[in-house]
Amino acid sequence: RQMCIRDNRSPSDIVLEVSSTMAPGDHPGGFAGACWAFTNADSLRFYRDNDFVAEFAPDRRGRFAALPHPPIEIHDFVGLLLEKYEGLDRAAAPQVAAILNEMRRDAMELSPLSRARMYSLRLSWNELLQLYYKYIGVLGSPSAVYRFEAVWHGRAVRTVVKEPVQSVRLECTVHNPILTDGPTWDCAAVSLRAIDQNGNLLPYCGEAVQLSVEGPLRILGPSVVPLRGGMAGTYLATTGEAGPARLRCRMEGALDTEASLTIRRREEERG
């Protein structure tokens, strides 16, 4: 008897992380290699400069088949773009796209089969390189805007955009914004991240963050913390008084950010 399993998830339960920064300079020799999407969605749509490239689904028979949500490999970076912009027919376009994707995956190396296809399509190496520079890209070539959409029940519910950094923002997250001071002091962990205009972590940002507090609060540790891998952290502790408090964070190259906390007072119980 066939069983029907109901999906009780909501759009807020869907996650999406992309393994690659899509920046050639982040990879050896400028060759990006494999790109994976980690998501619990049904499929993934991939766009380049607002042009739809392809849609990918989890491989449930591959090497990650034992996982409830196998990562999705993004293996086609050309898709239908050759038909749209180069005028190639439906027979030739997929073959040329396969050659370009192989060049991306294998650092410009071509298998004997791909070389045979190249000659049968009457493509010169220079013509192939021009297509590679245009649709895949190398160090120094114009950067594209890549968009990844996690598709769940037929609609996009999560989006990740990878593009050159245009602005830097300091993100401050207080993991326990309501503290209770009583017989002992209470404490909150704070996470700091340097992110770009799309919310992507900037792992090469190593600026120092200056911290200051207002209200019944004190910083546990130094008031200046350096970012490592684009991230840092600190701890805040109560001082024995109640009231509103505020943490201010300042970093060169980004707007100041702040976080609000509430300190409550619980009198020590008498025996």
Functional labels for PLM-detected ranges:
Residues 1-5:
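Short, small-residue-biased leader/transition segments that mark boundaries at the very start
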